[in-house]
């Protein structure tokens, strides 16, 4: 199955750590599902708001909130790895959802910030935008954990988020290598990410 192949490129897909979908499991584990759904939500928001060229650094409030969202996945992951507690599906999907929703902002800042330019356009105009994005991402993860009929939609969304995230890293690399050349960086990056993940997924299955 295509979605399973794409998920295999980046995720262990352990059945006991994944949500059920149909007769099997979702293409990504609970934590990765949260991460990549959050990533897709954030990228969709930034695209709709025409912020893909934004490069102004975060406000203090946005920077603090963004940093705080990284803590849950680190604490839960390390705590369960070292045996301090046993993580569960809710903790996995929520910690993934929170960090996934803030990663695209970091990527945009890394790609677009230019100390020689004014960097006038903000990634988030108000901290409220970031808060709402986080609530929506976490809400979808919580709904999935509750058993709401979201598995099919979020399975597709998570794989799209996977392509967007790795496409973002390719985009960052291309922008650094090519400088100010006017090229369709985003389209090239998404195509490269898709092909790379598809090939790796096939090798990992």
Regions found by a protein language model. Give the residues of each.
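Secretory/periplasmic and organellar redox-cofactor proteins
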Residues: 1-18, 24-25, 33-42, 46-205
């Amino acid at each position: 199955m295509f979605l399973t192949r794409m998920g295999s490129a980046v995720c262990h897909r352990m059945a006991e750590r994944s949500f059920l979908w149909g007769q099997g499991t979702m293409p990504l584990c609970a934590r990765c599902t949260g991460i990549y759904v959050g990533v897709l939500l954030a990228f969709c928001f930034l695209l709709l708001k025409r912020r893909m060229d934004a490069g102004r650094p975060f406000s203090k409030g946005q920077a603090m909130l963004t940093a705080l969202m990284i803590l849950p996945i680190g604490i839960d992951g390390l705590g369960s790895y070292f045996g301090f507690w046993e993580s569960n599906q809710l903790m996995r999907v929520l910690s993934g959802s929170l960090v996934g929703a803030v990663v695209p902002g970091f990527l945009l800042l890394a790609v677009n910030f230019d100390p020689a330019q004014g960097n006038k356009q903000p990634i988030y105009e108000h901290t409220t935008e970031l808060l709402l994005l986080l609530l929506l991402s976490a809400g979808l993860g919580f709904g999935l954990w509750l058993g709401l009929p979201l598995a099919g939609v979020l399975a597709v969304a998570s794989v799209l988020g996977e392509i967007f995230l790795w496409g973002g890293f390719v985009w960052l690399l291309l922008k650094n290598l090519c400088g100010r050349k006017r090229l369709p960086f985003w389209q090239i990056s998404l195509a490269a990410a898709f092909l790379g993940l598809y090939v790796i997924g096939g090798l990992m299955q």
